[in-house]
Amino acid sequence: MTYCHTDVSYFEIQHSCIFSLLSLVVERCTCNAKVASSILAGGIIPVLFFFPLFLFLYHL
């Protein structure tokens, strides 16, 4: 009976380990997506701001 119990607890530990690993991967992916979107926004916003300014100064 104790062997069966340890077997169940082992499977529970394995399942929780897999679940935590999966959640870590998901968290890492969402973090990377946030970083990528912030870099993209940080790259687009200055271009949208400076490009008309550059055109305006170029035509002067």
Curated annotation (Swiss-Prot):
It is a single-pass membrane protein. It is found in: Membrane. The chain crosses the membrane at residues 38-58. One of its GO terms (cellular component) is membrane. Keywords: Membrane, Transmembrane, Transmembrane helix. Partially overlaps YHR180C-B. This is Putative uncharacterized protein YHR180W-A. It comes from Saccharomyces cerevisiae (strain ATCC 204508 / S288c).
